[in-house]
Amino acid sequence: MKSYVEYIDSNGYKYATDSSGRIANAQGDLQLGEGIRNPYAQRTVGGADRLPTDDGGHLIGKQFNGSGQIDNLVPQNSGINRSGGEWYKMEQNWANALNEGSKVKVDITPNYSGNVARTHSFNVDYWIDGEKFIQIIMNP
């Protein structure tokens, strides 16, 4: 992706890239839906910096109409991304809130070391009906 670009996708989610063209931020008001997966992008995101234990993790989840393209994917440890993991549980919390009629807003910042394409952690600020929550998730 290009460096220092801000864009809004077709679902209203806003993204920004850093000097290396990596996703620096993703934010928006979540909506339930069914995004489309891109298995190739999920298998290859992160390139040489990707670990064998990584998934191509969606910053804005597929169940929220998140894009399946590289504009919304980062190398994410499968232990946090899959069922039972910390990211998975957080997304389930958001989905449950939306199903109950609440409004959910997210502001996700992937954290990188140097010029590597793999994040070491995520700072996630989110609001459910205006109440703010902060979660820091490590990406081992």
Predicted regions and their residues:
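Domain-level detector of nuclease and nuclease-like folds
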Residues: 5-140
